[in-house]
Amino acid sequence: MGIRFYKPYTPGTRNRSMAEFDQITETKPEKHLTSWIPRSKGRNNRGIITSRHRGGGHKRLYRNIDFKRNKLGILGQVATIEYDPNRNARIAKVHYQDGEKRYILYPRGLQLGQTILSNFNAPITIGNSLPLHQIPLGTEIHNIELKPGSGGQLARAAGSVAQLVAKEGNFVTLRLPSGEIRLVSKSCWATIGQVGNVEQMNLTVGKAGKSRWLGRRPKVRGVVMNPVDHPHGGGEGRAPIGRSRPVTPWGRPALGQRTRNATKYSRNLIIRRRK
């Protein structure tokens, strides 16, 4: 996948870059593998905003992705590589020998027509899925489960890759894309390889309108608000925040303050914090 840069025909194209779609082989999704999911717009079940700066954006059909990879012992052939508006990674449609079709995350280097397999003794090749205790040390993996049978939750974004660095007892040690090193049950499953579309991190939006297409609303700085709206607000002209450290709109410490719950059960599974 390459990156397309634009000449400054307009202010919006001056700094814009976007991914090329030369890898995409199909433009329309498989109908029975899609569903319509109402968009939350950052609201909870009571209509209260729980995640700010969300709303609007282009309509989307949700693609049902197979994160569990639980079709054991049945070979599947990669039929298409498709765009998914719900994530920055590409997806691949797999035709299995029993006639079923499923979407999976597209790993980097997977070719059309290539066969993949999910099994306890599957070969260590790109796209295959197997338990962590069956994967050799140093192997690059993605779509990793946190609990056996729950489906992949770690290393799913474009270009993400984790590495298996140790095995001991009932756990294996993983180096995650964030730099965190943590323990995961050896019975959890993972997929071999790196998630595709690795150039995603180098793209620039270019204009505010594209953020609106993606469902991202504007972010207003607290320092330009009134005191009734934000602790940083108020003052005469361009005044400083008037505090020893920045805080959230609700007065909690922000920008660098650790907010992870110290009593969370998984604290003992984290060997080194993320960077």
Swiss-Prot record:
Where do the record's region annotations for Disordered lie?
Answer: 223-255
Location comes to:
Plastid, Chloroplast
UniProt keywords (A-Z) are: Chloroplast, Plastid, Ribonucleoprotein, Ribosomal protein
NCBIfam families reported in the protein's UniProt record = rplB_bact (TIGR01171)
Its ancestry begins with:
Eukaryota, Viridiplantae, Chlorophyta, core chlorophytes, Chlorophyceae
Which InterPro entries does this UniProt record tie to the protein?
Answer: NA-bd_OB-fold, Rib_uL2_dom2, Ribosomal_uL2, Ribosomal_uL2_bac/org-type, Ribosomal_uL2_C, Ribosomal_uL2_CS, Ribosomal_uL2_dom3, Ribosomal_uL2_RNA-bd_dom
What is the protein's quaternary organization?
Part of the 50S ribosomal subunit.
Q: Which GO terms describe its cellular component?
A: chloroplast; mitochondrial large ribosomal subunit
Q: Name the SUPFAM superfamilies for this protein.
A: Nucleic acid-binding proteins (SSF50249), Translation proteins SH3-like domain (SSF50104)
Coarsely, its chief localization is plastid
Q: What is this protein called?
A: Large ribosomal subunit protein uL2c
Q: Name one GO biological process term.
A: mitochondrial translation
> Is Chloroplast a UniProt keyword of this protein?
yes
Q: Per the similarity annotation, which family is this?
A: Belongs to the universal ribosomal protein uL2 family.
A Pfam family for this UniProt protein?
Answer: Ribosomal_L2
Q: Which GO terms describe its molecular function?
A: rRNA binding; structural constituent of ribosome; transferase activity
